[in-house]
From Swiss-Prot:
Catalytic activity: L-aspartate + 2-oxoglutarate = oxaloacetate + L-glutamate; L-arogenate + 2-oxoglutarate = prephenate + L-glutamate
Task of the protein: Catalyzes the reversible conversion of aspartate and 2-oxoglutarate to glutamate and oxaloacetate. Can also transaminate prephenate in the presence of glutamate.
Residues with site note (Important for prephenate aminotransferase activity): K12
Oligomer and partners: Homodimer.
Name by which UniProt lists this protein: Probable aspartate/prephenate aminotransferase
Record organism: Rickettsia bellii (strain RML369-C)
Subcellular localization, as worded in the UniProt entry: Cytoplasm
Keyword Oxidoreductase: no
InterPro entries: Aminotransferase_I/II_large, AspAT/PAT-like, NHTrfase_class1_PyrdxlP-BS, PyrdxlP-dep_Trfase, PyrdxlP-dep_Trfase_major, PyrdxlP-dep_Trfase_small
Single biological process term from Gene Ontology: amino acid metabolic process
């Protein structure tokens, strides 16, 4: 009898973390690798947030807190939803966890029964399907390629709903594509949901504040307040405030769900880090002006990367409305031979080619559930980004 649970047989290690690990190994070996695989901002946590954390340490705020988060942070989250999204939540409808990932994990563990279906538009964030599988749910994938601007339409959603459907996942702006749902697109989805009262929605808004070209962000509970009790909204401080390592995410939904998720959290991690919670209060309540400036910097990086990569004859590029990724179609290169005679048959092969020939680390599209693409993160310096894109252009030009 194996000591490892059979439930883990269907679960794969994170492919994005695997790319990061491989990149670090090559760098340690002295190879000049430019990594475009990581999904975190390249700026530091603002000083006012750090100072709030230091004060919390000096004040001795280092003990257990409420499992679901300290009142001050839940109040800051409540105010954020009202101020930015025009949504009213009671404090009992809010939970704070150790990152947005734990919020989503707790949500599915609390709500899924064996065989319940979760509709996941592909490409998707790599952890969605595995978290559904761990909760004994069934992922149902909706292929949303570049021809549909990487977004799920109401009409396509209608075709996927069955009596077993329990959740739909919406991630806007999206990882890995940066595609973002407009007001009318969300309204279209809401119209379908009204016909199916047993279908709930998990809205992952973690990239909410990183949008470009004047794009106006909306979240589904804002568009369809009549569906609020069926919508669970996930957010956090990781991306907007560059606090990926602080591990604070939060969610808002029905009191019944929050209560169930709190029970799960109480028997796993207990409360999120007390010091990180104080830092998150300062993030949400403190000055916000730098967020727009950071988004503008990402927009400039997006434009730089596109200006180079659009020249590659094998690539088809989508101009994203947000986040800090490009998800580039590259299937025209399949069948090409490298100088060593190896045939590039899929996105994994192409990722390996770029790593070996261009010394650039990217993430193959198959990791996100859609073959024929690859993802780059442009959350790096302008100089490094330009060099990486030029290397990729040269590497493709030699095929």
């Amino acid at each position: 009898m194996s000591i490892i649970s059979t439930q883990l047989n269907a679960i794969k290690p994170s492919p994005t973390l695997a790319v990061v690990r491989k990149t670090l190994e090559l760098k340690r070996a002295g190879i000049d690798i430019i990594a475009l695989g990581a999904g975190e901002p390249d700026f530091d946590t603002p000083d006012n947030i750090k100072e709030a954390a230091i004060k919390a340490i000096k004040d001795g705020f280092t003990k257990y807190t409420n499992v679901e988060g300290i009142p001050a942070l839940k109040e800051a989250i409540q105010a954020k939803f009202k101020r930015e999204n025009n949504i009213d939540y009671d404090l009992e409808e809010i939970i704070v966890s150790t990152g947005g990932k734990q919020v989503i994990y707790n949500l599915f563990m609390a709500s899924l029964n064996k065989g319940d279906e979760v509709i996941i538009p592909a490409p998707y964030w790599v952890s969605y399907p595995d978290m559904v599988l761990l909760a004994e749910g069934t992922p149902v994938f909706a292929n949303c390629g570049i021809e549909s601007n990487f977004k799920l339409s109401g009409e396509a959603l209608e075709q996927l709903i069955t009596p077993k459907t329990k959740w739909l996942i919406i991630n806007s702006p999206s990882n890995p594509t940066g595609a973002s749902y407009s007001h009318s697109e969300l309204k279209n989805i809401a119209e379908v949901l009204r016909k199916h009262p047993y279908v709930n929605v998990m809205s992952d808004d973690i990239y909410e504040h990183i949008t470009f070209d004047g794009f106006k962000f909306y979240t589904l509970a804002e568009i369809a307040p009549d569906l609020k009790d069926r919508i669970f909204t996930v957010n956090g401080v990781s991306k907007a405030y560059s606090m990926t390592g602080w591990r604070i995410g939060y969610g808002a939904g029905s009191k019944a769900l929050i209560k169930a998720m709190t029970i799960i959290q109480s028997q796993s991690t207990s409360n999120p880090c007390s010091i990180s919670q104080v830092a998150a209060v300062e993030a949400l309540n403190g000055v916000q002006g730098y967020i727009a400036q950071n988004a503008l910097n990402f927009e400039k990086k997006r434009d730089l990367a596109l200006s180079i990569l659009q020249r590659v004859k094998y690539f088809e590029c989508y101009k994203p409305e947000g986040a800090f990724y490009l998800f580039i179609k590259c299937d025209k290169i399949f069948g090409a031979k490298t100088k060593s005679g190896k045939v590039i048959n899929n996105s994994n092969d192409f990722g390996e080619y770029l790593l070996e020939e261009a010394k650039v680390a990217v993430v193959p599209g198959i990791a996100f559930g859609l073959e024929g693409y690859f993802r780059i993160s442009y959350a790096t310096s302008m100089e490094e980004l330009e060099e990486a894109c030029l290397r990729m252009e040269r590497a493709c030009g030699s095929l």
